[in-house]
Regions:
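Histidine-rich, glycine-flanked metal-binding segment
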Residues: 1-23
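Structured loop/turn residues at beta-strand edges in well-structured enzyme cores
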Residues: 8, 53, 87, 117
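Hydrophobic faces of well-ordered beta-strands that scaffold small-molecule active sites
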Residues: 24-30, 58-60, 89-93, 120-124, ...
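Active-site mouth loops of central-metabolism enzymes
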Residues: 28-41, 64, 87-100, 178-184
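Short beta->alpha linker loops
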Residues: 69, 95-97, 210-214
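Histidine/acidic residue-rich metal-binding segments in metalloenzymes
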Residues: 101-218
């Protein structure tokens, strides 16, 4: 005989005999371009596409137009998801060199972590990427790691190395140039730096899109 599962009154029963039951996947880094660029994608269309592919939860990034760096901006995204998303969802607030008080409003402090419903953590771009969010100076990173609660998720690339190597690559237009410019050493340097900050300040850390074996081995 099978297990002891039984339906409660009013619950829908799906006959799945002979089928596979698979867990929904979680995508911890999506870039639904809402607000600012809905012609590319918005929360509704992105979540429907996710669900069609078996992704039942997503965490969205803050490098929108404009960037989501305040609680007010975050609440607008959360409200849109409440109306339009068809999956579970969460949102990262973007860090800047001078918005620690906004981050605290969203996720609290080390002594009093108080994440706002719908906000899953702080996104720190240690290297420049799409959008205008960039925090790479040590004093600003220290301030964020020392004075905020919750989880910090990093785009871990070393900005100084990117700038040093840019003259070598700025005339390249081939697809390989991107990976060669943003090389393994660039990623490792930032991952090591973020890890040291997290350890020094006892802060939870998630390194997004870790891309190299040397980072994993380190």
């Amino acid at each position: 005989e099978g297990g002891g599962l039984s339906a409660d009154s009013g619950e829908v029963i799906i006959d799945a005999e002979g089928l596979f039951l698979l867990p929904g996947a979680i995508d911890p880094q999506v870039h639904f371009r809402e607000p600012g660029q809905p012609e590319k994608e918005d929360i509704g269309s992105g979540s429907r596409a996710a669900a069609a592919g078996g992704v039942t939860s997503f965490l969205d990034m803050p490098n929108n137009v404009p960037a989501a760096t305040t609680l007010k901006a975050m609440q607008s995204k959360i409200d849109s998801a409440t109306r339009n998303a068809v999956t579970h969802h969460g949102f990262f607030i973007g860090a800047t060199p001078n918005n620690v008080s906004d981050l605290q409003d969203a996720v609290g402090t080390p002594d009093n972590p108080s994440p706002t419903d719908g906000i899953c953590g702080i996104k720190v771009f240690m290297g420049s990427s799409t959008g205008d969010l960039l925090v790479h100076q040590q004093k600003h990173l220290e301030n964020i790691f020392a004075n905020t609660g919750g989880i910090i998720a990093t785009h871990a690339e070393d900005e100084d190395r990117l700038n040093e190597r840019w003259p070598e690559f700025k005339h390249r237009t081939d697809i390989a140039a991107h990976a060669e410019w943003r090389d393994e050493t660039c990623a490792l340097m930032a991952t090591q730096r973020a890890s040291a900050l997290a350890k020094d300040h006892d802060h939870r850390l998630h390194v997004l899109h870790l891309t190299s074996g040397i980072e994993a081995d380190w």
